[in-house]
Amino acid sequence: GKCSVVCPVGVEGDKIRIAHRSRKKYSIAHDYSLIDEGKFIGSMTEKRRVLYFMGCMTALTPAIRKAVTAIMDKAGEDYTIMDGDGGICCGRPMLVAGRKDDAMEMIEKNTKIIKASGASVLLVNCPICYKIFKENYSLEGIEILHHTEYIDRLVSEGRIAIDRSETKYVYHDPCELGRGCGIYDQPRNVVVAAGTLVEADVNGKESICCGGSIGSLSLGFDKRKALTENALKHLTCGSPDVIVTACPLCKTTFNRYSDRPVADIAEVTAERLI
C-alpha cells in the first residue's frame, strides 16, 4: 500500500499486483475445497447486537481475543462471537493471491452467516479482515467497526473508563488500517487515554510495514527481518516503554525482534480498565 501512496505518478501497485496474480490463478495448485465442507461456519444460537469476528490471526493470538471480550464485558455489551470455534476466513488472503472466484464464494457464505445473526454491528480487530468487509461485502444495515473505532467510541460515550498511567507508548500504524482504510485518529485517542503517546519519526500514511505483509509473499526471511528491524528502529526513536499496534499480524511480527513489550491496543485498554 505504501508504494501507491508515495508514487509520484499515482500508480496503484497493489491493484496491479493482484490483477497480475489473478491471471496466474489456474496454474497455482492450492486446495480451497474446505469452503464447501461447511466446517468453517461455526455455531451461533443467540442473536446479539454485536457480532465479533476474530479472524485467522486473532485465533493465533488469543490474548487479543481475551482483551476484546473483557472490554465488551466491562461495557455491558450484548455480543456473540462469529468464529469462536475458529476456522472462518474473511477471504482477503485468497483475493490478494489472485483467487478472486474462491474469495467471492467465501464472501457469499460469510455474508449469509453475518446477516442471519441479526447483529447491527460487526466488530473486527484484524485490519486485513476489516478492509475486505468494508470494500467487498454487501452488509447494508450493519455497521462495520474496527476495534480501535469501537474502543474509542466506548471511551467517548463513557461506557468504559481507562486508568491513565505514566507509561510511554508508541503507536504503529498497520498498513491496511492506516493507508488502507484511513484510520489514524481513533487508535491514538485510545493510547492518549491510557498514557503518554510518543510518535515514531515515521508514522501515519508514511508508516513502515512491520514485515509480515501477506501481499509480499515473495520476500524471503532475511528481507522480511530487515523490514521489521527498520520499522522497530523508527518506532523506538523516542524511547517508548511499549510498542502498541492494532493488528494481530503486526504484533506477532514485532514480537520476534523487539527489545521491549509489544501489545495490541485492546490489551493496553483491558489492563487499565477501571
Regions found by a protein language model. Name each.
Residues 2-274:
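Iron-sulfur cluster-binding electron-transfer modules in prokaryotic oxidoreductases
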